[in-house]
Regions:
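The feature marks non-catalytic terminal segments
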Residues: 48-185
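Active-site beta-strand->loop->alpha-helix modules in alpha/beta enzyme cores, enriched
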Residues: 1-55, 76-77
Length: 185
């Protein structure tokens, strides 16, 4: 248990996610034990990754990291409905005009390739709500990224990067997008 927890803590400290989303609950109704274990480990690692006394040998290579929240993506599947109206909701049913498909259609195509578990389902368009419940940290209210800095100020070199990006955007030529390559490289 400690070895796999150490691995999960390493990943959190290495990649420093602001949010962790689990697909399965910690209580077992999400299917087999691997599903439950993944949720339990994510919640334990949330706390352990921020604690310098947990897996201190890792700190030669990474630093402690406090993720803002762990969200469980609740579900209504197989007669088991864990969604509630007071949970945070995100509409994932948008349409991508560049791809000519809705995200529901893309998801259905991907599930149709998971042949070993019979996940093929009809595609759908239109509103499709996903529900989230905070299991660690705070529950978002207005946006999945509530309370999280999403500007370039989040990183040390951020102001310089922002200045460069702003300059590229201001000088972008829709007729000659290739002119931006040098600045991007």
């Amino acid at each position: 248990r400690e070895k796999i927890l150490s691995d999960v803590v390493w990943v959190i400290r290495r990649f420093q996610p602001d949010i962790i989303i689990t697909r399965f609950p910690t209580t077992g109704e999400g299917g087999h034990g691997h599903h439950t274990a993944s949720a339990i480990l994510a919640n334990e690692a949330f706390t352990a990754a921020a604690d310098p006394n947990r897996f201190p040998d890792q700190l030669r290579y990474v630093q402690v990291w406090q993720t803002k929240r762990v969200l469980w993506n609740t579900f209504n599947f197989g007669g088991n409905n864990t969604t509630r109206e007071d949970q945070f909701k995100v509409d994932v049913g948008g349409y991508n005009p560049l791809l000519g498909k809705s995200y529901g259609e893309i998801a259905a195509e991907s599930r149709s390739q998971h042949k070993s578990q019979g996940f093929g389902v009809p595609s759908s368009r239109g509103e499709s709500l996903e529900y989230f419940k905070a299991t660690k940290g705070d529950q978002p209210v207005n946006d999945l990224l509530d309370g999280i800095t999403t500007s370039w100020n989040k990183i040390d070199e951020g102001p310089a990067v922002k200045k460069m990006v702003d300059s590229l955007v201001a000088g972008f030529d829709f007729l000659h997008p290739e002119n931006s390559v040098k600045g991007l490289v």
